Amino acid sequence: MQQEALGMVETKGLTAAIEAADAMVKSANVMLVGYEKIGSGLVTVIVRGDVGAVKAATDAGAAAARNVGEVKAVHVIPRPHTDVEKILPKGIS
């Protein structure tokens, strides 16, 4: 795993997740690396980039998602340990 920050926005429903993803990549220099359907309608969108950009992106994504649905969680990991890659959904690491 690169030493880039990892940002996550978890929403209730796919529409809010797509809205969050769109806002995140438009608002900051981040790379959309994937999403994960958790179950019970929960979807987590994951981005990577430098810490400041990821923080700005997750803030924008959460705000956009709240306009069309429900945000369950927002989190930024500034420098994830390399072992975190083992628990990320396939295709995201």
From Swiss-Prot:
One of its GO terms (cellular component) is bacterial microcompartment. Its main location: other. Transmembrane segments: none annotated. Pathway: Polyol metabolism; 1,2-propanediol degradation. The keyword Transport applies. Keywords: Bacterial microcompartment, Transport. It comes from Citrobacter freundii. Disruption phenotype: When the whole pdu operon except this gene is expressed in E.coli no BMCs are made; with the whole operon many BMCs are produced in E.coli. This gene is not essential for BMC formation; a pduB/B'-pduJ-pduK-pduN-pduU-pduT strain produces BMCs in E.coli. Artificial BMCs can be made in E.coli by expressing pduA-pduB/B'-pduJ-pduK-pduN-pduU-pduT (in this order); pduT and pduU are optional, while pduA, pduB/B', pduJ, pduK and pduN are essential. A construct with the reversed gene order does not make BMCs. Ethanogenic BMCs can be made in E.coli by targeting pyruvate decarboxylase (pdc) and alcohol dehydrogenase (adh) to them. PduP(1-18)-Pdc and PduD(1-18)-Adh strains targeted to the BMC (PduA, PduB, PduJ, PduK, PduN, PduU) make significantly more ethanol than strains where Pdc and Adh are not targeted to the BMC. InterPro entries: Bact_microcomp_CS, BMC_dom, BMC_shell, CcmK-like_sf, CcmK/CsoS1_BMC. Belongs to the bacterial microcompartments protein family. It is found in: Bacterial microcompartment. Pfam families: BMC. One of the major shell proteins of the bacterial microcompartment (BMC) dedicated to 1,2-propanediol (1,2-PD) degradation, probably important for metabolite diffusion into and out of the BMC. Overexpression of a C-terminally mutated form (PduA*) makes thin parallel filaments with a honeycomb-like assembly in cross-section that probably form nanotubes. The filaments interfere with septation. PduA is probably the hub for binding multiple enzymes to the interior of the BMC. At least one of PduA or PduJ is required for BMC assembly; it must be encoded as the first gene in the pdu operon. One of its GO terms (biological process) is propanediol catabolic process. The keyword Transport applies. Homohexamer with a central pore; Lys-26 and Arg-79 interactions are very important for hexamer symmetry. The hexamers pack against each other in arrays. Interacts individually with shell proteins PduB, PduB', PduJ, PduK, PduN and PduU. Modeling suggests PduC, PduD, PduE, PduL and PduP interact with a cleft formed by the C-terminal segments of 2 adjacent PduA subunits (on the BMC luminal side) in the hexamer. This is Bacterial microcompartment shell protein PduA. Residues 5-89 form the BMC domain.
